[in-house]
């Protein structure tokens, strides 16, 4: 296991060492080019620099906040409306590191639980790091104060499965991070059994 930042750093370095891949930074996409056909085909991109470029296939991998559906609609491709569902959850996380020489107490199953009013999980990473995460309803004000470090640690102390990791001498690496406004989105480029566009794909994050 690895922290997301570590994973992305390793992935980027791996990609940069691939001679068949070109990474361009600071270049924004403003729209797509298409060819006229029974099923429209996306053939290229427009950039915020005013330039454009042709491609055989385009994958919009910029996640749930992507403007890709708008790019398609702007050139007359009717994209089905996305389905959006609010998770109604707030996450609170804090990251820790164990002392050198202390092994993470990793077992063969996740360290997680659902108490009904509170979910928790311990997620281990690289180099002796791990995080403890709590999830609560975004309408339950009982745990809103858990963003306070002392309150967070008092909740950790009350959950044996989480406390075990802290008791190994873990040192906090961060304060308490919160994340809310979590929306699940479902997008499709099909209407019934028919695809609405060729040469273009969207994936989430």
Outline where the language-model segments fall.
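Active-site-adjacent segment of FAD-dependent monooxygenases/related oxidoreductases
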Residues: 1-10, 93
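Predominantly flavin-linked oxidoreductase catalytic cores and closely associated redox partners
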Residues: 17-161
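Mixed-charge, polar/low-complexity N-terminal
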Residues: 3-4, 59, 76-77, 104-105, ...
């Amino acid at each position: 296991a690895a922290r997301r930042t570590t994973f992305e750093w390793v992935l980027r370095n791996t990609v940069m060492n691939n001679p068949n891949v070109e990474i361009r930074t600071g270049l924004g996409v403003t729209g797509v080019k298409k060819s006229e056909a029974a099923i429209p085909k996306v053939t290229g991109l427009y950039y915020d620099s005013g330039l454009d470029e042709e491609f055989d296939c385009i994958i919009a991998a910029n996640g749930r906040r992507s403007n890709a559906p708008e790019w398609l609609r702007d050139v007359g491709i009717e994209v089905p409306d996305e389905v959006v569902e609010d998770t109604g959850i707030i996450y609170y996380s804090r990251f820790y590191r164990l002392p050198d020489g202390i092994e993470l107490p990793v077992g063969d199953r996740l360290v997680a639980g659902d108490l009904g009013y509170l979910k928790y999980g311990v997620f281990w990473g690289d180099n002796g790091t791990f995080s403890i995460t709590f999830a609560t309803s975004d309408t339950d004000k009982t745990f809103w104060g858990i963003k306070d470090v002392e309150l967070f640690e008092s909740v950790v102390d009350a959950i044996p499965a989480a406390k075990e990791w802290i008791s190994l001498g873990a040192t906090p690496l961060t304060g308490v991070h919160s994340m809310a406004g979590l929306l699940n989105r479902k997008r499709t480029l099909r209407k019934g059994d028919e695809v609405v566009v060729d040469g273009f794909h969207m994936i989430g994050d």
